[in-house]
Amino acid sequence: MSGNTDMPKSDTPPVVFIVDDDPDIRSSLSRALRLRGHTVESFENADAFLERYDSSMFGCLILDQGLPGMTGLELQRHMNNQGIPLPIIFITGHGGVPESVQAIKGGAIDFLEKPFRQTELIERINAALEAAKTQRKSESRKKDARARFERLTPREREIVDHMLRNPSEASSKGIARALDISPRTVDHHRARILEKLLVNSVAELIDLALRLDEAPTTDV
């Protein structure tokens, strides 16, 4: 049994998505990013981006606010409604304070006005990609934890719930009293629980549960 609960690293590289109707900006920015080793995909409008994007992709989005058709802010709202988690950096040639405030409230990590220094934008992109990698790792760890808990039987889950809600009564005798079963039966279930969850101790079990916010708040 292994106590190592880290997920394996994904080989999928992050993607910098660029959505801007200006072909010169798309071309120059794509070239600069590729020279720095980034994977880049660019689109002239929001519909083309949405047609290409799927949930297996991660990275960040460089988004022009003044797009024809669906605007940048409208695309941001659509992404939020659909649960698309890409960090967004807005770029605009005619944005004002209301637009920038709306974008930031919607979850954008930055709002730059054209003309911008390319080096400044690339710095923001690098920060956004680091945030995306951290988020992806967190989601992978949560998915892994959820899959482990789904292996438990209803009785095993009942025992785990008791252990999380009542850590001071997490001994075999304490659980046996609470659930009206024998300590020997509890010992058998505990061994199976640790095996299924791939943990070596109750402390590791609690750490795994916290990834899913599974640990209930005890009453004071």
Task: State what each model feature region is.
Residues G96-P98, L112, F116-I125:
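C-terminal output helix
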Residues E51, L73-L86, Q102, G106:
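Short amphipathic alpha-helix used as the core "switch/output" element in two-component signaling
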Residues R146-R184:
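Helix-turn-helix DNA-binding segment
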Residues E44-N45, T71-E74, T92:
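Acidic catalytic/metal-coordinating carboxylates
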Residues S56-L63, L67:
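Active-site beta3 strand of CheY-like receiver
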Residues A191-V220:
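Basic, Lys/Arg-enriched C-terminal extension of HTH/homeodomain DNA-binding domains
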Residues T12-I25, L29-L33, A46, L61, ...:
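Conserved acidic segment of CheY-like receiver
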